[in-house]
Amino acid sequence: MVGTINESMQNMKIGAKETAQSAKQGIKNAGQSSSKTARDVMGNPVPGSYTAGNTANDGDSSYASSKNLPGNADIGATSSERTAYAAPQRAAVDTSNVSPPSTQTGGYASKDTTSTYEGAQPLSSQSSRSSNYTNVKITATQNNVDALTGAPIRIVTTTNARIQPDEKTLQDLLEQRQVALREAREAEEELQRARQYNDRSTSEALELEARAKKAAQDAELASERAREAQSSIERSASLREKQAREEAERAATALREAELKHRLAQANADVDVANSKLDIALKNEAAWKAERESSLAHQKAVIDSARAELERARHEAAVADATYKKEHYEYNALVAELEERNDNTLRTASIREAEARNLEVHMEDTLKDARMRSRNATEQVEVVKREINSEIDVYRSSVEKTKAELASYQKGLPSQKEACDRELDDATRALQAAFQDRFNAAKLRVNQFDVDSRQQLAMLTKKVRDAEDAEEKYRISCHQREEEITRCATQAYDAVKAAEKRNETIAEAARAKENEAKDLYSKAESITQDLNAKRSHPPQPANLDYSSAIQRAQERLTLEESKLTDLRTAEPSQYVNDVEVARRALRDAQAEQSKVESEYNSVKGSKLYTTEPVHPHAVTTNEPTDVSTKSKSAAYHYPATTETVSSKAARSATTPAYVGGATKTPSTTKAVESTPSTLPTSASTNAAATTTTKKPKAAKSTAVRDDVSSASSDSDKGTTGLGKSESKSSRKERRSSTSSGHGLMNNVRHALGMSNK
């Protein structure tokens, strides 16, 4: 059962992970699409636009368009990618370069300035790179048109969604989308305030119109004086009149082109809005699908839990049955074991009693045998002692007898020697007296007696010595035999003592066995009591009914499976219809864009001048007079949406919030703004103050990608590009309908033959 529950929980976790991963992948794809759109917008501005760093220091407006290069688009993309995971930020930029008319002699002295309103600054990238979050960038774009100049203003609202990898991801994403929409509405309100601020320039336009009327009156008076002048002046006046008509026609064409360009910008803005709505609809659809998959995974997990509960109920019923059987088998085994233990205990007790009796009998027999052997040894010792004593007495009597013979012989020896000496003396005297022969015979007998006596003494002495030696040897042997008999008697006595001691040990063992037998009998009695108690209380089956629990688990499983079927057969969400509506709106906007662009291409680039102006008061500026080499994006352009942190920090302290303010930026701010706007975002605010103005190496190129090509580069959203086949030269000619210096009114004054005073 535990394995089944673990498996179901594992499957549930895997399903939730797959759902979260699919939702994250969809959100990531949407974020990549939005990031790509933002990079295209920031790196590829539309025709007529230039970034905050497009103001040249040498006063040549021809460099205004060369600062925004295709090569810088990559840098802009890199900047966008580096700030893709920052905090939500908003930027409304209007780079209209319409400047109020100024009275001058010899040209214009001031250059166009650019101001930017910025939203929240990005957070530190370190805090947004946490491994516990998945960062998704959501970009919402709104396009509006300035009421005075007709310049489009693009509001880009960027929200960085920091998604946690858990089941609250979708809800957090929806809340962050609401935050992004709310910031877009706030940006729109700021745009309204910017328009109100720009309305103050209307009075300047009226003043310019009054000056134009006054200049027209002055021109009429001059024309009257010219008709009164010489014929050469009349020819010059007729030539100026012809040029004025041509310039008027050119101005009308420029106005038409400006109107079409405004419509084209509006169409491009509508396409961007449709793309944004399509992105939002696709994200909503992906979020709905992810939520649906999450609900399905949750319901499957609930079904797995119900199935596990059913299996658990069945398992508990089986466990209860098995428990009863186990207890019954254990009871039977315990009764049999108790019976066997009782029999074994009684048998062992009887064996121990028999062993104790045998030990007692063995102890008595051993003691009797030892005592008998000890008594026999003692009797044998006494017999041997008596025999030894009698034999010793015999040897002693023989020795005494020999000693007595020796003593009697030695005792009679002096008398015999004296007798022999007397006889020798007698013989000697007789010899001396009469018989020499007798003396010799007596001397011979004396010598013989000495020899015999010595031999007899030696023999007797040897006999005595031999008798003593024999007595000594016999005494020694008797002593050894006595010692051996004594040792045997001692051993017999020791055996008796050992037998007595052993009998004590045997007696203790016999008593221990008797005690063990008593304990075994008492144990057998307790076992008999336990056996009787077990037999009187056999195990009973558990009175638990598990069928109701199994039925409830089965009903819950059926109910959850029906809920899963309802979820699978549910109607598709409204987000699918919203996607279709957004796609139709995008197709309509692209069709309108194609229509306006074709009309604009048919009107742009009209060349109406046939002669050069010869008015003595022709416009002279400090800029090059070659109109074809100047930027044609002075009056109508798109704002750049990518700016460096350093330029933002430098302008936020010195410039007004919107374009058109009367406050002029200091030279330090100009130096900061003249840097390329596509610097990496890692540049700090301190570095902005020391940044020197450097022109990019690719500044020779004057080609700028228009909004149509930037919209068509977003191929992953299905946007149809309309300007891919246009060359750089055609895009340059597209901006040739307006004046390069200071907007449409300069063209009107030039066409009317008026000079700036």
UniProtKB/Swiss-Prot annotation:
May be involved in the metabolism of very long-chain fatty acid-containing phospholipids (VLCFA-PL). ATP binds at residues 718-725. Residues 166-604 form a coiled coil. Residues 589-598 have a biased composition (Basic and acidic residues). Keywords: ATP-binding, Coiled coil, Nucleotide-binding. This is Protein lsd90. GO terms for biological process: long-chain fatty acid biosynthetic process. Disulfide bonds: none annotated. Residues 1-11, 19-36, 51-69, 94-118, 619-632 have a biased composition (Polar residues). It comes from Schizosaccharomyces pombe (strain 972 / ATCC 24843) (Fission yeast). Residues 1-131, 224-244, 589-633, 657-757 are annotated as: Disordered. Residues 674-693 have a biased composition (Low complexity). GO terms for molecular function: ATP binding.
